[in-house]
UniProtKB/Swiss-Prot annotation:
Organism: Polaromonas naphthalenivorans (strain CJ2)
PROSITE patterns, sorted: G_TR_1, G_TR_2
Alphabetical UniProt keywords: Cell inner membrane, Cell membrane, GTP-binding, Hydrolase, Membrane, Nucleotide-binding, Protein biosynthesis
Protein name: Elongation factor 4
Domain tr-type G: 2-184
Catalytic activity, reaction form: GTP + H2O = GDP + phosphate + H(+)
Length: 603
C-alpha cells in the first residue's frame, strides 16, 4: 500500500487539466504515441467539442521514481465547471492528494478556489502547479502570490510546467510520490469499497468505479451494496490504464472497476459502500457493519420541462432519460402533464450548462426531438392554512388568495474579475437584485461577493457576465437559504385560456415589464389565424398587458359595384358573425419558438 498514490487534478475551465492528464499518461507509458489523441480522458464527443470535461475519468499508471521504486499512481480527472462541482467532490473523496493547476498567464479564477476549498474540506493534500509556462505572457510570481492570497496555501514550491511542451512533467510525478500521502486503510479488515462513479454499458450492464478502502475484493466474491442491500457476484474486476485491464483482485487503496451483472443503475448508487456477504459458499468470514461516509445527495437547482415534439415519442423519451440517468447521477426527472404540450417530464439539473448538455446529449445520442420550457428554480410557498410546500413548476403555484408568502432561493455568488471590469459587473449584479456583501482586491484581481436570487441567475446571468467583462470574469455560487420575497406568478393567456407551460415567476417590480415583453414577443411568433387572437399577461385576475393578432380576412365586398351601403354592411356583418363563431371553437397552435421566447426577453 505504501506504493499507491491516489490523486486528482483540480483547476478552472481551460487551465489545462485534461492536457496535463494526457502528458502524465504518456510519460508513464499508459498509451503508445499513436494512440495519444488530445484529451484522452474526455471520451464524449460533446466534451471534445466544447473542450470541457463532464464526467470524471480515471487512469491507473505505473511510475518508476528516482528512488528506484515503482509506484502505482491512480489519476482521477475532474471537471472544472461550476455545474459539475458534484463530480469534483466525488473524485476528491476517493483521493489523498490533488494537483491544483493554475494557468500562469491567468492566475487564480473562481472555480479554482471553489474546487480547492472542496479539497481542503475533505482533508486532501493540495500540490500547486503552474501550467502554461511556455506562453510569453506567463507571470509565475503573480500567480504564486494569488494562490497564497486568495486560497491561502503556500505556493513557494509551486511546480512550473507546461503540459503542452511536456516541461516539468517529471517534477510533477516526483512531487506526487513525495508529497501526497499513501492511502490509509486496513488491508486485513472487512472489505469496504466506495462507489465513485457508475455507468451503464450495453453489454455487461452497470460498471462501478470503486475505491477500495479496507480489505480486498477478489474475482468471484459475493458482494453486497449497503444502501440498497442488494447482493451480486463480482464477475469482472480491473483497472483503467486508460484501457481496461483485467485483474484477479483489487487491494486496499486501489481504484478500479467492478462488473457484477447489475441491471439497473439505481442499485449502484454513487457514494454507496460495497462489502462482502458473510458466510455461505464464497462468503467472507466477516462483513463490514459501518458504511463509509458518502457524499451528500445532490440537490437539483434548476428545473425545466422536457416534452417530446410528437406525443407518440413519450415512451422513447422516457427510455432515453432512463439511460442518460444511468450515466449522470445528478439528473432528476419525473413525469408531468401540460395542457399545452401533453405528456413530458419535469427535469432537475445542477445548473444551466448541465441543462444544455443533457438536452444536447438527448438530441445527439438518443435522437430525440425536444420541446423545452423556460428554466425555473424551486420556490417555497407558505400557504394560508400554515403549511409549506416546495414548488418547482411555476404553473403549480396556488392562486394569490391562498398564499401567505413565497420564498425564493438565495445564493451566495463569488465573482472574480480584473479590476477594469468591476463597474460593469456591479451594475449587472444590481440589475439582478444582487446585494453586495464584500469586495476584496488581490493584486489586479477583484473578488466580489453578492447575495442574489437564484431565479435571476438561471436565465442569462452567466452569458451577460461574460459579455460585460469580455470573458474575463468567472463565477461560482452556492445555495444559502430560502427567503421571503415579493415575487408573483405571471400567466400568459391565449383567447382567455391559460397556457400553463408559459407561466413565469418574476419579482413584482419587473412583472409589468416582463409581461409586456413576453406578450409582444409572442405576437411576433404566433401566426395569424382566421380570427382575432388576444394574447394577455395576467397576475391572478389582473391583466397587465395585451396584444391582439388581427384576423386574416377575405375582402367580402369586392364583388359589389357601387350601389347600396346596406348591401355591403350586410356582407360585413355576416363575415363578423362567422369570425365570432370561429373564435369560440377555434384553437391556437403554440409553436416551439414561443416557449423559448420567454428566455430571450431582455431585461
Amino acid at each position: 500500500m505504501n506504493h499507491i498514490r491516489n490523486f486528482s487534478i483540480i483547476a478552472h475551465i481551460d487551465h489545462g487539466k485534461s492536457t496535463l492528464a494526457d502528458r502524465l499518461i504518456q510519460r508513464c507509458g499508459g498509451l503508445q504515441d499513436r494512440e495519444m489523441s488530445a484529451q484522452v480522458l474526455d471520451s464524449m464527443d460533446i466534451e471534445k467539442e466544447r473542450g470541457i470535461t463532464i464526467k470524471a475519468q480515471t487512469a491507473s499508471l505505473k511510475y518508476k521514481a528516482l528512488d528506484g521504486q515503482v509506484y502505482n499512481l491512480n489519476l482521477i480527472d475532474t471537471p472544472g465547471h461550476v455545474d459539475f462541482s458534484y463530480e469534483v467532490s466525488r473524485s476528491l473523496s476517493a483521493c489523498e492528494g490533488a494537483l491544483l493547476v493554475v494557468d500562469a498567464s491567468q492566475g487564480v479564477e473562481a472555480q479554482t478556489v471553489a474546487n480547492c476549498y472542496t479539497a481542503l474540506d475533505l482533508g486532501v493534500t493540495v500540490v500547486p502547479v503552474l501550467n502554461k509556462m511556455d506562453l510569453p505572457q506567463a507571470d509565475p510570481d503573480n500567480a504564486k502570490q494569488e494562490i497564497e492570497e486568495v486560497i491561502g496555501i503556500d505556493a513557494t514550491d509551486a511546480i512550473p510546467c507546461s503540459a503542452k511542451t511536456g516541461m516539468g512533467i517529471d517534477e510533477i510525478l516526483e512531487a506526487v510520490v513525495a508529497l501526497i500521502p499513501a492511502p490509509k486503510g486496513n488491508p486485513d479488515a472487512a472489505l469496504r469499497a466506495m462507489i465513485i462513479d457508475s455507468w451503464y454499458d450495453a453489454y455487461v450492464g452497470v460498471v462501478m468505479l470503486v475505491r477500495v478502502v479496507d480489505g480486498r475484493l477478489a474475482k468471484g466474491d459475493r458482494i453486497k451494496l449497503m444502501a440498497s442491500e442488494a447482493t451480486y457476484n463480482a464477475e469482472q474486476l480491473g483497472v483503467f490504464t486508460p484501457h481496461t485491464e483485467a485483474r484477479q483482485a483489487l487491494e486496499a487503496g486501489e481504484v478500479g472497476f467492478v462488473i457484477a451483472g447489475i441491471k439497473e443503475l439505481q442499485a449502484a448508487r454513487v457514494g454507496d459502500t460495497v462489502t462482502l456477504i458473510k458466510g455461505g459458499t464464497g462468503g467472507a468470514a466477516f462483513t463490514a457493519t459501518e458504511a463509509l461516509p458518502g457524499f451528500k445527495e445532490i440537490q437539483p437547482q434548476v428545473f425545466a420541462g422536457l416534452y417530446p415534439s410528437e406525443a407518440s415519442e413519450y415512451e422513447s423519451l422516457r427510455d432515453a432519460l432512463e439511460k442518460l440517468k444511468l450515466n449522470d447521477a445528478s439528473l432528476h426527472y419525473e413525469p408531468e402533464v401540460s395542457e399545452a404540450l401533453g405528456f413530458g417530464f419535469r427535469c432537475g439539473f445542477l445548473g444551466l450548462l448541465h441543462m444544455e448538455i443533457v438536452q444536447e446529449r438527448l438530441e445527439r445520442e438518443f435522437d430525440q426531438d425536444l420541446i423545452t420550457t423556460a428554466p425555473s428554480v424551486v420556490y417555497e410557498v407558505l400557504k394560508a392554512d400554515g403549511t409549506t410546500i416546495k414548488v418547482e413548476n411555476p404553473s403549480k403555484i396556488p392562486d394569490a388568495g391562498r398564499v401567505n408568502e413565497i420564498r425564493e432561493p438565495i445564493v451566495t455568488v463569488h465573482l472574480y474579475m480584473p479590476q477594469d471590469y468591476v463597474g460593469a459587473v456591479m451594475t449587472l449584479a444590481n440589475q439582478k437584485r444582487g446585494v453586495q456583501l464584500n469586495m476584496a482586491y488581490h493584486g489586479k484581481q477583484v473578488m466580489l461577493t453578492y447575495e442574489m436570487p437564484l431565479g435571476e441567475i438561471v436565465l442569462d446571468f452567466f452569458d451577460k457576465l461574460k459579455s460585460v467583462s469580455r470573458g474575463y470574469a468567472s463565477m461560482d455560487y452556492e445555495f444559502k437559504e430560502f427567503r421571503a420575497s415579493d415575487v408573483v406568478k405571471v400567466d400568459i393567456l391565449l383567447n382567455g385560456e391559460k397556457v400553463d407551460a408559459l407561466s413565469i415567476i418574476v419579482h413584482r417590480s419587473q412583472s409589468a415589464y416582463r409581461g409586456r415583453a413576453v406578450v409582444a414577443k409572442m405576437r411576433e411568433i404566433i401566426s395569424r389565424q382566421q380570427f382575432d387572437v388576444a394574447i394577455q399577461a395576467a397576475i391572478g385576475a389582473n391583466i397587465i398587458a395585451r396584444e391582439t393578432i388581427k384576423a386574416l380576412r377575405k375582402n367580402v365586398i369586392a364583388k359589389c359595384y357601387g350601389g347600396d351601403i346596406s348591401r355591403k354592411k350586410k356582407l360585413l356583418e355576416k363575415q363578423k358573425a362567422g369570425k365570432k363563431r370561429m373564435k369560440q371553437i377555434g384553437s391556437v397552435e403554440v409553436p416551439q419558438e414561443a416557449f423559448l421566447a420567454i428566455l430571450q426577453v431582455e431585461d
